[in-house]
Amino acid sequence: SETLAGTPDGAPTELFLNSQARRTLAAHPQRAMVLAQSAKDGGWSTLGLTTPAYERVVRAILRQAGDWRPRETDNAARLDWFVPLLGHADARLHQLAYLEIGRAPYGEVRRLAGRIPARTLETLLDEPRYLEWRNLAILMLGESAREADRARVRETLARKARFGSSLNLAAWATALVAVDGVDGIGRLESLYLTNKAREDDELKAVIQALSVHAKADATLRAPVAEAYRRLLDTHPRLAPDLVHDLIAWQRWDFVRQVEQARDALDADPLAVYSLGLYLRFAQAKQGSRTPQWRTGTEAPAASDRTELGETP
């Protein structure tokens, strides 16, 4: 046996190997089983039988141990290293690459998308065994320069809107904005945000997509904020899902709508707290008195709107 990393504690390796693994090792003595020992209880687990490619990757990862921090998501060089493994014939390496790239920030996913072969994306999108991995492929599809891929994004989003499906909707909505920019935001407004019949899970998926883009691209914050405004006009109950972004972007011009939503949601203490936090920030930033709380959804008086920087 060979120790790849760490220091053996001298305890015997007690591990059950199934019959298939034993037969494979007997037939291919050059192969080995990779084992890992738990630092917590000393127990052993199997990481799989080696193939030449799998062994090379395991050894290479261990060599990088000093440079890679646990659970880091913003190491561009590390992400670049895993890109060639996405779509690898060895499913374990393919999964490993997905787990690394799939937790990267959206900006990194966009950067890497052009390096993923079209065939790999098609496999991730179309094969049922990759259903739970589909979101990453959808986000990357949104970065494609191929018109067929861009058309697929538009058509899939339209179909989801038609059938009221929220499965992977956040990813498809994100891809649509990547494809069509501000026009895509407008499309999401008309299909979802201003549609009174939409369910909350659909609306929250679209909010997530818009938020991702506005965080990644400051030039989209203004159109996204206006989309939020129209959403609040139609679905004020979703105000708690928006105030984090509004605070981060210092958009204090939503006071009237947030105040109305706060009064309407007064039975939900968490909603009241988050909306009240926005209103307190707005009051502090605007240098005016805290708006008076009202019952129902009555709009602030003209004098209140003037104090808060809005035109009466």
Show which residues each predicted segment covers:
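Solenoid-like repeat scaffolds
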Residues: 86-90, 122-129, 155-165, 190-200, ...
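Basic, polyanion-binding surface patches
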Residues: 1-47
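Eukaryotic acidic, Ser/Thr-rich intrinsically disordered low-complexity regions
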Residues: 267-312
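Structural detector for internal amphipathic alpha-helices that build alpha-solenoid repeat scaffolds
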Residues: 61-72, 95-111, 132-146, 167-180, ...
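Short, structured interface segments
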Residues: 38-69
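N-terminal "cap/leader" segments of large eukaryotic alpha-helical scaffolds
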Residues: 59-88
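Mixed-charge (acidic/basic) macromolecular-recognition segments
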Residues: 81-91, 96-103
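Amphipathic alpha-helical scaffolding segments comprising HEAT/armadillo-like alpha-solenoid repeats
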Residues: 75-84, 107-123, 147-159, 181-193, ...
